Amino acid sequence: MKGTEEFLSAPAENAVFSLGYDARSILTDADSVIGKMYVGGSISLKKKLATAIEDDLKVRTAAVSDSSGRGISVLVSVDAYGLSLPDVREIRQSVAGLAKEKNINSITVTVLHQHSAVDTLGMNGNIFEMALVNPAKVLFGGQTNNGKNDAYMENLKLKCKESIEAAVGSMTAGKLYYGTADQSAYLIDKRAPYVSDSSFNRFRFVPSDGSKETWLVSTEIHCVGNGAAGTVITGDYPYYAEQVIHETAGANVLFFMGAQQSTSQNRNEATVENYREDMTRLEAMKGFGESIGKSVCAITDETEVAPLLNVRYKKILLPISNPILLLAGKAGMFESLVVKNKDGVFVSSELGYIELGTDLAFAVIPGELAPELAYGGCLQGDASWSGEDWNYPSMQEMIADSGRTLRVLDLANDQVGYIIPDNNFMPMIAEESNSLELVSLGKKTASCIMGEFAALIEESR
C-alpha cells in the first residue's frame, strides 16, 4: 500500500470528509497476563513479568476518505510499547480482502509507546535466555524466544483486524476542524537543543448526521508515567485524558505520538489534577492525564480543514552500525526486517508523508525522531558532539514551498529506535546521551531518513 496514487493540490469537486471509528480491548484475561507476560519499557536483568493490571489496553482506529475516489486511508493506534514492520504487515494482510473491496490505499499502524504495556516488541523477555540460549537456537534452526507472547500477539492482530473492519464499515460524512492547545508546560525535554512541537494538536470530526464526534489528538510527551521499569500494566496518561474527553465532550478519541524522542512528563501543581507532593506514580499519572484531557477539551480556536488527504509511503533501508543492537538481533530480542547485502546490514522499513487539507502535513516516521530534524534547530559546529555542522534542511524546510505546517506521526509501522542527527551522535556512556544512542541503529540513521524524506517529497509532487 503506497497511498494515494495521485497527489491533489486542491479538494475534488463536491469533496467532503468521511470518517469511521472503532475502539476495542486488546488485553486478554488477567490470569493469562499477570505473572506470565513481560512488560515493555527498560530492559531488566530480572524477569520483568506483569504483577497487576491498572488500565485496559486498546486498539483505536480511524478510517478517513476525502471522497475524491482515491480510496480510504486507515490510522490504527495501539496501546503498546512498539510493533515491528513484520507484525504490521501481518495486520495489513489480515484485511487484504477488505482493502481490495473498499479501495483502502494505506494502513498506518502506530503505537503510543507506553513503557507499561505488555511487551509487543520482544526486548523485555528473559535476558539470560535470549543472550545465551537463543544464539544456539539460531545456529541449529530452532525457534527463539523473547518478550513477546504468541497468544497475546495473535489476539492483538485479530483485534486490529476487527477494528479496521468496523471503522471502515462505520464511515459517515462530516467536517473536520483543527485546533491546538499549549503543551509546553506538560513536557520536559532531556536533551539539547530542546526543540519540540509546543502544541497538543486536535483534529475534531463532526458528523453531518449528528452522531458522536471523533477527536484525533497528537502529543509529544513520552508515556512513562509509571516509570520505564515498572511491572503494572497501564495505558498511561492518554487513557485518563480519554476518560475526561468522553465525560466532557462525549467524543470518540484516538491519540497518536509526535516527535517525542527525549521528552518526559513534567508533573507539578500546574499539570496534575488534585496535585499532592506525596502522590504515588500511578496517582500522578492519572492526574496528569486528566489535566491534559481538560486542556484538549478547552480548545476553542479552530479552523475547518479542507477535504483533502494525500498519502505516500516509501520503502527504505537503514544501516545498522550499533554493535549492541546487532548482537540483540542475533539473540532474538528484536524481530525487525533485516537485510544483508554487499554494503552491510540494514533494517528494511517504511517512511511516509501525508498532506491533510491545504495547510498541514505529516512526516510519518518508523521510530523516535529528534524533533529538531522535523522543525529545525539542529546543533551546529562546536555546539554539536562532533564539532561538525548538520547540512540537511529540516523536514519543515523541505516542504516550505507548499505553505504547509509540518507535524510528525512517530513510531509508525515500525520501531527502529532513536533517530539522532549524525553530528550530535555521541558515545553511549556520555552523560548527555540519556541512553539514546544505546537503542539507535547507528550514526547514519538520521541522514538516511532525511535523504529518503527529501526523495519522498519529490516523488509526491
Predicted regions and their residues:
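Conserved beta-alpha junction segments in alpha/beta enzyme cores
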Residues: 1-276, 280-287, 300, 304-461
